[in-house]
Amino acid sequence: MKVEEILEKALELVIPDEEEVRKGREAEEELRRRLDELGVEYVFVGSYARNTWLKGSLEIDVFLLFPEEFSKEELRERGLEIGKAVLDSYEIRYAEHPYVHGVVKGVEVDVVPCYKLKEPKNIKSAVDRTPFHHKWLEGRIKGKENEVRLLKGFLKANGIYGAEYKVRGFSGYLCELLIVFYGSFLETVKNARRWTRRTVIDVAKGEVRKGEEFFVVDPVDEKRNVAANLSLDNLARFVHLCREFMEAPSLGFFKPKHPLEIEPERLRKIVEERGTAVFAVKFRKPDIVDDNLYPQLERASRKIFEFLERENFMPLRSAFKASEEFCYLLFECQIKEISRVFRRMGPQFEDERNVKKFLSRNRAFRPFIENGRWWAFEMRKFTTPEEGVRSYASTHWHTLGKNVGESIREYFEIISGEKLFKEPVTAELCEMMGVKD
């Protein structure tokens, strides 16, 4: 099948059907009516306003525009008051400042307060940029809406769509800028094959250059990197996917990949064959939003991984997972058990003062000289990675992220073997260990 034929079929997966479009229009009309009754100044922004939303992902974003003279407290209070008044049902959510998420005629809606500014350089918070983003894109994206949908669908099917910390992928705004810059999905994919970690894409100037990091210049604020939340690994995944797609295009690139789930018995055999120590730190999930939770999980995972390296347990990889009730930090180590004794390096024999200090310590075994340097046998506090992590998490919980650390301090357990394989982490374990279908 030719690329063009594949993309035609892919469009069926990403373009909303007539019913979804009708539902959106009805909700928009009702929302406009309610806002107009309140005499509020507002603007519809985002993928719905620009007709670039993905099939099945209908959500309306409306920004309330307040005068610059309003204090942040006035903006917050008035924004919440209006949001509550115009939605059928609602909940308060938090970004840089609170906003209202809810439903109008069965469609999800975000009502976000911001300042009405003349210039983007005068922004007081990140959301103040959004109306400028919409204004810049509105005319330029016309006629390319489905190209945006193809790119979003391609990214979503491969797990790298969304700038939130849980994903650290491509934002919707970034997708639209790439389509404006390259002109189509296919041209974006062709060119992305040559991206590097130092590629700079300046959309407003229409140029690609080399810089210090992967940087997509915001046409509204040239100092801002639209790709700042995109992780290096997800950039690499996208480049690889683009190369694969151009070598052997197929509709499969637009179909969601289901996480590999295998039976505990098969997982047990895989771990046995690998001869490694596989275990998890399990603790209660802190009651915080994902964008605060996931950076802390990443930090905790990294800190424990570094500890395992220092203690010579030779960790291979780590992963983490948050379920409804619990969080899991997953690790695989090459060393299942290490000797109790190890050798500690001391000073060279010429260093009299430090030699004296080194030899004065009370040890179970005699120190010795090797290649002109003093060495000593010392005893480890723990001989398995599980013992080590139990000790480290108990004493260093305060280094593992504010909320995650507190949760670990209150309760945690180290689980492995059959108990671990019965927890809802099999997909993450398979990914961590590179298990094939």
Curated annotation (Swiss-Prot):
Cofactor(s) required for function per UniProt: Mg(2+)
Entry keyword set: ATP-binding, Magnesium, Metal-binding, Nucleotide-binding, Nucleotidyltransferase, RNA repair, RNA-binding, Transferase, tRNA processing
Any matching Pfam family: tRNA_NucTransf2
Reaction it catalyzes: a tRNA precursor + 2 CTP + ATP = a tRNA with a 3' CCA end + 3 diphosphate; a tRNA with a 3' CCA end + 2 CTP + ATP = a tRNA with a 3' CCACCA end + 3 diphosphate
Positions contributing to ATP binding: 47, 50, 133, 152, 161
Effect of residue 133 to A: No decrease in both AMP and CMP incorporation
Binding, Mg(2+): 59, 61, 110
InterPro entries tied to this protein: CAA_C, CCA-adding_arc, CCA_tRNA_nucleotrans_2, NT_2-5OAS_ClassI-CCAase, NT_sf, NuclTrfase_I-like_C, Polymerase_NTP_transf_dom, tRNA_NucTransf2
UniProt miscellaneous comment: A single active site specifically recognizes both ATP and CTP and is responsible for their addition. In contrast to the eubacterial homologs, the specificity of the nucleotide-binding pocket is determined by both the enzyme and the tRNA.
Name of this chain's protein: CCA-adding enzyme
Gene coding for it: cca
